[in-house]
């Protein structure tokens, strides 16, 4: 559907009862408000709907709280999970007095990033392809009270359940630590669930490809077809929503926390990127690994700004429990063809149209609109300023001698470091008014609240290490 009239015709012919308007907050979570169909007409889509922005963390103060949700009718689809027929529509957030995009709206930032590309003349389209991993548990308990702090996770797949009593017996098929990549059922216990997740995403407009079990016990990944920056961020929101919903229907619970389990692999979100112009791939050329000079400069920009990028690509305190050596996490800021230990990988392909950069340090806790936009702006800064990424590193970086390893820069070691890096290095984000300084400052304040709570809260491991000191 491309016009409000088409949406209204669809509503009538499909007996739609409600329209659900959705938008993304600065932390990356979908929010929504549902309207009875008697409220929906052409003006509903043309004029937008007012709401209170002061209730959204990181947005307006209560004395200037009015904001406007403007539906993007091209995103309209029937939500497959609601009992009453409900049309879901993704919205942009506007200033009600001017009708201009709100500077702190993540989707608005992503749209400005695409406009910025076209204004430079370097390209007309930027494609993104995220690979977001996640865990599914049968039972999760956690508490963060001053006198009772801890968590407990359970899944039928966990190796610790080898002697657990189950109704009907313990059937014994269990994935070992770091042994979960690609096994068939019954070791893979979630085949049908993942298929249902993929099917529900397709119903909501996402372009789907595949699904499989991941390395850790209870860890999974579904594949989305790459798309333009804003569309792909929209689809990743659908991806997360459908995974949460289907897991819930199965009586299970999904999480996109980067590192919920100590000692096993964490969940990453490798992000493939490429720029096109006039229907031709800008990243294909005759340089290293058949890349263009522009692509190498793009990589140079990502590596140069990686520490400030971490504030958007790895925005949780938990993100930095994944970004440690030894768990397939790409902490070293280098690039290579096919080498998965480098933070920027060039996937092998003979097809010039498939030439792309895979940035491997992001995780699924990221707000996709902000993460994709920031990665793109860093790469564009590399192209515009011809930033040399240095020589490629084709050997296994984790096997380098300590002296050589110290010469390679790394991603941040904590969210505090990432936010401090963003405070110092953000001029590249301000170009084209894509990110506004006001948003960056408010984002840092918002995330620093999380850092402060985490740093001030005693941890169970500290009791284990220090209680008897």
UniProtKB/Swiss-Prot annotation:
EC supergroup of this enzyme: ligase
Gene, per the UniProt record: glnA
Enzyme Commission identifier(s): 6.3.1.2
Name the UniProt record assigns to this protein: Glutamine synthetase
Organism listed in the record: Azorhizobium caulinodans (strain ATCC 43989 / DSM 5975 / JCM 20966 / LMG 6465 / NBRC 14845 / NCIMB 13405 / ORS 571)
PROSITE patterns named among the record's database cross-references: GLNA_1, GLNA_ADENYLATION, GLNA_ATP, GS_BETA_GRASP, GS_CATALYTIC
Residues that coordinate or bind Mg(2+) 2: 133, 214, 221
UniProt binding sites for Mg(2+) 1: 131, 270, 358
Regulation: The activity of this enzyme could be controlled by adenylation under conditions of abundant glutamine.
Reactions that this protein is recorded to catalyse: L-glutamate + NH4(+) + ATP = L-glutamine + ADP + phosphate + H(+)
GO biological process: glutamine biosynthetic process; nitrogen fixation; nitrogen utilization
Compartment annotation: Cytoplasm
GO molecular function terms noted in the UniProt entry: ATP binding; glutamine synthetase activity; metal ion binding
Binding sites annotated in the UniProt record for L-glutamate: 265-266, 322, 328, 340, 360
Family according to the record: Belongs to the glutamine synthetase family.
Record-linked SMART domains: Gln-synt_C
Record keyword Nucleus present: no
Keyword annotations of the record: ATP-binding, Cytoplasm, Ligase, Magnesium, Metal-binding, Nitrogen fixation, Nucleotide-binding, Phosphoprotein
Residues engaged in binding ATP: 209, 272-274, 340, 345, 353
GS beta-grasp domain mapped to chain residues: 14-98
Summary of the function given for this chain in its UniProt record: Catalyzes the ATP-dependent biosynthesis of glutamine from glutamate and ammonia.
Description of how the protein assembles with itself and partners: Oligomer of 12 subunits arranged in the form of two hexameric ring.
Positions where O-AMP-tyrosine occurs in the chain: 398
Residue span(s) of domain GS catalytic: 106-469
Textual note on the cofactor: Binds 2 Mg(2+) ions per subunit.
Cellular-component GO terms for this entry: cytoplasm; membrane
Named cofactor requirement(s): Mg(2+)
